[in-house]
């Protein structure tokens, strides 16, 4: 009888151990996938950078840095504008992370007029102002009484008038300067020319539709859009080493305090690359000059 009881106890112990072993095996099996999952972290989503720009040359230059930014984990969205007001408005309102279309004097003028606090994050390029003519091949051929079309806004208007004075077409006060600014009303002697100030983005179109003999002072980017070449078509231009070149360098603008953010610094680094400088040099034939 004792042997039977001992045998029963032994068998019970064996089954008990087997049960413990079988219950622990699935636990190990269910833990394994969890460990594997822990090593497979989801890929980070690309960080978006939204930049407003005028089409030529700014948006074209921005297109050149999309791949470089993608390699750094950024997706570049380019919003194209055809005027000088909306890109700053959108930036101030937070729709854009940055814009790239303007120079510092225009940016400063916009801030003063609109109570905004937008700043330059980097200098990228310069677009020489040029004098272009309808049926005129040199400054000396500009006929008496000809119409001269210039941009109307303060900063671009000043620049245009100083270039006209440089070429002897008008006379301005002795203290006329980029810093002080001048308007059509400040012209001391127009030498019989009819100087008309119009919205900057319409100057080129108005020249194309004007009477023969008309000339116009056109912003570099609008000249490009209209098919003009500084090297081939301009009757006169600003020098690339002039005060105008330094003053009117085109900048990447951002909201104050964001110029050193990671994505803005990534954007600036990409734009100030050797590849972009080469693109500018080879593409724009002197109409756009890299300043980095």
Regions found by a protein language model. Name each.
Residues 78-89, 177-205:
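Short helix-initiation/N-cap motifs at beta->coil->alpha
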